[in-house]
């Protein structure tokens, strides 16, 4: 990483310009996993909402893709979507490979040390996904999962919050939600943490699973708002301000409708 940043800095000096080459580009390049429905997923179907994956097979679709498309249109630029593993998203912004992370990412304190975030573009709630035939479907307090095996996604808040459950059997996290679902269905874990829209999509595709919602005051203590991640120390730039302005032009009502539609068209095949 240090080598990458030094190389980038050298390139900027040699170019004789203090700004990123991206600023003069006519594209808005975003990164996402394309494996986190209904926020984002990969598909072979070309639709009105899907965008061709850059350098990859098929298309990207989902809530994040529609939001990114709206922003790109407002910026007067062509949207380019790159499929990047979760752990590679921040380095991709830092190196200039992408302009922004639009991938259901929460702006926590650790990430804010290396990224600048816009205001939230979606607010959700935390739930647990369990097997439909289990007694856990009646739970309404996270502490009822004490003694049970619970798993979350690797390198996310949704893994670290599991330790808020006293006596929980915190399992090794998985890299993607498809992996988590398989672990749950095979009995390797009893519950997986997820945001409600993600859980809705998973249960829609897997009728053998169910969602556990928690009562007020008995849920995880976690920020479930997701924001757009941009390169660090760019908050005062025209690029950041233009992206924020474009995001602000999407009303809360429109955002809810975009998510509702994304959940409906998310893949239901396992």
Q: What residue ranges belong to the model's regions?
A:
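A ligand-binding cleft/hinge motif common to bilobed small-molecule-binding domains
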Residues: 88, 104-114, 161-164, 190-222
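Alpha-to-beta junction loops
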Residues: 76-78, 94-103, 148-149, 185-198, ...
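C-terminal motif of bacterial Sec signal peptides marking the signal peptidase cleavage site
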Residues: 15-16
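Extracytoplasmic small-molecule ligand-binding "clamshell" domains
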Residues: 23-104, 113
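Acidic, polar ligand-binding/catalytic clefts
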Residues: 73, 78-144, 218-221
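Bilobed "Venus flytrap"/periplasmic-binding protein-like clamshell domains
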Residues: 37, 57-74, 105, 127-181, ...
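Extended ligand-binding regions for polar small-molecule ligands
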Residues: 65-74, 148, 156, 223-268
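Periplasmic-binding protein-like
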Residues: 34-35, 123-130, 204-247, 267-270
């Amino acid at each position: 990483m240090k080598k990458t940043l030094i190389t980038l800095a050298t390139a900027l000096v040699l170019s004789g310009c203090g700004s990123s080459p991206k600023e003069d580009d006519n594209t808005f390049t975003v990164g996402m996993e394309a494996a986190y429905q209904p926020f984002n997923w990969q598909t072979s179907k070309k639709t009105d909402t899907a965008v061709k994956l850059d350098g990859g097979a098929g298309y990207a679709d989902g809530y994040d893709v529609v939001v990114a498309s709206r922003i790109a249109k407002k910026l007067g630029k062509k949207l380019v979507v790159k499929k990047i593993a979760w752990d590679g998203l921040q380095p991709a912004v830092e190196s200039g490979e992408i302009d922004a992370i639009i991938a259901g990412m929460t702006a926590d304190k650790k990430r804010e040390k290396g990224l600048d975030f816009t205001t939230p573009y979606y607010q959700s709630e935390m739930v647990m996904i369990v097997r439909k035939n289990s007694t856990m479907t009646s739970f309404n307090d996270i502490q009822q999962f004490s003694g049970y095996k619970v798993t979350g996604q690797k390198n996310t808040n949704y893994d670290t919050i599991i330790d808020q459950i006293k006596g929980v059997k915190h399992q090794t996290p998985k890299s993607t939600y498809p992996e988590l679902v398989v672990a749950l269905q095979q009995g390797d874990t009893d519950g997986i943490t997820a945001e409600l829209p993600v859980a809705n999509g998973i249960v829609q595709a897997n009728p053998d699973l169910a969602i556990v919602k928690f009562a007020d005051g008995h849920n995880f203590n976690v920020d479930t708002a997701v924001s757009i991640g941009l390169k660090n120390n760019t908050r005062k730039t025209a690029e950041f301000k233009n992206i924020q302005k474009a995001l602000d032009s999407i009303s809360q009502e429109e955002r809810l409708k975009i998510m509702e539609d994304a959940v409906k068209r998310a893949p239901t095949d396992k």
